Amino acid sequence: MNTKLNIIKALGILAIVAAAFSSSAQQDPMYTQYMFNTQTINPAYAGTWESLGFMVLGRNQWSGFDGAPNTYTFTMQAPLRNERVALGLNVISDKIGYEKRFYVYGDYSYLVPVGEKTNLRLGLKGGFTNYSHNLEEHNILDPNDPAFIGEITHSFKPNFGVGAFLYSKKAYVGFSIPKVINSNFDITSENFSIEGELRHYFLMAGAVFDLGENLKFKPTAFTKASFTSESGTPVQFDFTGNFLFKEKLWLGAMYRTGDSFGFIAQFLFAEKLRVGYAIDFSTTNLRHYNNGTHEVMISYELKFRKEEVVSPRYF
């Protein structure tokens, strides 16, 4: 019985890793609350808060399944004395099975006013990804399998990205390529190899509509595309609808094509502190083997300007 369970466990982890690195959907960490975490994929988003801001996010994908992806994210953005310039920082730890990726990227964003109430930000992102894989941690049936003989392997890959973000108080459109350079991690053994980073194109849009004195509706759409031969899913779409009650409570739902659906809740404290929770449920065969995906986000803003804030940020 134990041997059978070990085989099932090993096959399960192998299936997760294979799916994660053979399809475009998992080449970079995915987020359900992407509309408040845009900076990780679009450097032009830095500066849109118009204040010093911090965000932390933890995502436990396919909860209850050994070796499933776990992602921890920290971002910050800060305007400079030159009000048109803002800087950002993104630090991400992503683990799938025995494989780990650690991302550190800095952002530069420049503001171009295009109208009385509309702004365009252009951004540049630069940094690196460090990949590591500890072959000795594998619980395998054959300890002499040459594919799993070795110690910790590492690979370091620098990269850069570009982005644009057009926005007003209640609407936005963004486009970005967070990693321009296609690269491989060049970690291979007799029976297994790891793909590196593929170039992805992101297009996003959202708007806020007043439905009443204390009720607003925000639909958003998010598209991720990769046109390389290595990508298993060339195009993926996210659709989200959120309702805002009394400028404090967000409640909504999301759908990701070919992957999952879920629900989102966020609460705003004093317009500076935002706490959000999201849960996803897989629509693939993996739904039978996990308890959903859980995501918690906390963001905080330090506002130094004296003018009164009329309403909170909508994205």
Give short role names for the model-derived ranges:
Residues 1-12:
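Bacterial N-terminal signal peptides that target proteins for export
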Residues 26-315:
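Subset of outer-membrane beta-barrel
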